[in-house]
Amino acid sequence: MAHPLRHVVHQGPVLRAMGSLAVQALEQRFRGVGSTPCDLEKSIDVELPPRDAAMVADYIRWTGGDRQAWKGQVPHHLFAQWALGLTHELLCGAPYPLAKAVNAGCRMEINGPIPLGEPLQVRASLEGIDDDGRRAVIRQRFVTGTPSSPNALVARLDALVPLGGKREGEKRTARPTVPAAAREIGTKLDYD
């Protein structure tokens, strides 16, 4: 892309979510992680404006795609551009340090094209949370469609949040150390 910041105006929801996450992380750091239970029945239904055609074209070019193959369509794998903005709203108040969350997987079920130039109808929902005390796996579901292509994409995002706890009865073992009397026997392995 010739102008890397050209499309930043289209990233408002994601940037707001990242800013809100940073504020939440600071609050959790100074006040402690809250204990507000997550509403597993919560879902968010929104209609988003059509994706900008120039942004989509630049995205296709940036990913090495064929613009002719995607002519008149939004690539399904661009869904994070609208889904991540909803993630924070969906998980707002979750009792987990979300700033530590890492991607634990993504599954996409493609049921049809996402036409370019049509508003997106998105339903975001929380599918479940698997918390074993050491880590929490948060499963979210995003269904995206348009008026002419409803339910075109069903995407599931999994996020893993390390909690730092230990299993019951698990003893902490000493970290392995190099003995003081050890000496180096080599520095290079030759595989020839």
Describe these PLM feature segments.
Residues I44-D45, R51-M55, I114, Q121-V122, ...:
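Hydrophobic/basic alpha-helical segments enriched in Actinobacteria
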